[in-house]
Amino acid sequence: MSARPDTPTHADEKRAVLYGHPIPENSFAVRDLQHKLPGVGLFDLRRLKSGAHACTFCGACQKKCPVQCIDVRLDRSRTHGTGKDRHFAGTITIDERRCVTCNHCMETCKFDALVPTELYHEHRRRVQKVASREPQLSSGHGLCSGCGAGIVVNQVLSQIDSHYVVSGATGCLEVSTTRYPFTAWKGSYIHTNFENAAATLSGVETAFRALYKRGKLEEKVKFIAFGGDGGTYDIGLQALSGAMERGHQMLYVCYDNGAYMNTGFQRSSATPLGAWTTTSPVGAEQPGKIGHSKNLTEIMVAHRLPYVAQSSPHDPQDLMHKAEKALAIDGPTFLNVLSPCPRGWRSDNDSAIELARLATDTCYWPLFEVSDGTYRLTYRPRHKKPLGMWLERQGRFAHLALPGNEHLAEQLQVFVDEEWDLLLRKCDEIPEAQWDKASSRHKAEPFIMHPRRQHLESLGEPLTASMTYTATEWDDF
């Protein structure tokens, strides 16, 4: 990350005016600005003979970027002239931590305005090295089509160059990758009970530590536990809390799909308000799950761990970077990763990554990290999207658009907004209202949910709020 210049730039001053108060030193806005100065990041801007930049700030590169790491803003107040003499002014922000060096931005620019720097080529070599590593979870496993868990595992384990031991709690990931006598794991793997993945790994780590002290082992081994939300938020919370409090050298990764998916879609304490599950059915007496989900990430922060982070598989650079940091720390660390489940969420098999991205852009699942008690936001949506855009893509929330249930979607939106504002304060970030003011050219439109009602109609019953769906009927969803 480039250092911030000592002298405030025009962009600094303008951003401060837009926000209405000084910018906090470690805020997302300051880090955002660091890439706006030509020559200090991955790209420079090509200059014309007149001395002006070739870039017209048209936004084509921003639209083409598959990982949304580019932000283009045209400053009309400083754009002047006509025809060939026209000079464009604005800012281009490129998040070098998120960039995957796909070259789409340069290929789509018809003015060849973006010129890669040596830093870009260095970053590209680093990305290609990670991409060329052999996946540690082999193909041929039994995970459902579109499951997010396998993606999470391979992204986390891609950051390990040494030997490792994985402890896997009973759940979707375990039963689908370790069907006796076969295994999809290329490293050492221990299948534990539902509730004791962290406890088992604690014993393994302690045994290795004893062997190190006796001089019987020299090579350092990494210890990683994987558990779903059922085995982490609920059944395995006691073992997890104990392992974290005792300070074992291990990384615990929770792949959160929002319910007990392996055993038939029962609700867990990670299930969102209003979601359909087989134990929180939709009907006249109960419109889905009652109550909001537990904030496990904050519970882990309360354990005063050296590193806690929340991530998502749609942003591999973010997840892999956090896994790398967590594995390098001497002590217990925790990652909470969203893991879309097409079967349980009643979504399309090819929509997992898009749903993960929407969860982040609606701020239902923000990306942040806490290092030794210091909060830091690692991604902030350019324009925060309405939660309904995420809800309507999932059949488990389809009933929220029916008469009498609209208030649940509103309650969930209010809850997400409050949690997001609280996180912004913890991260010393600019409030959402002032962030929107800085993006004044974006006009938020009222959002109305349009779920995939044809799936409900296919059940052969009228669309009413009093409908109750059995597990069998929803299996046909």
Segments and roles (model prediction):
Residues 2-4, 319-477:
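Glycine/aspartate-rich loop-and-adjacent alpha/beta segment that forms the canonical ThDP
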Residues 73-75, 117, 167-169, 253, ...:
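Generic beta-strand/beta-sheet core signal
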Residues 88-113, 142, 174-175, 364-379:
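Short Fe-S-cluster ligation motifs
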Residues 57, 61, 66, 105, ...:
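General structural feature for long, well-ordered alpha-helical segments within catalytic domains
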Residues 126-252, 265-275, 289, 302:
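Cofactor-binding active-site loop characterized by glycine-rich and histidine/acidic residues
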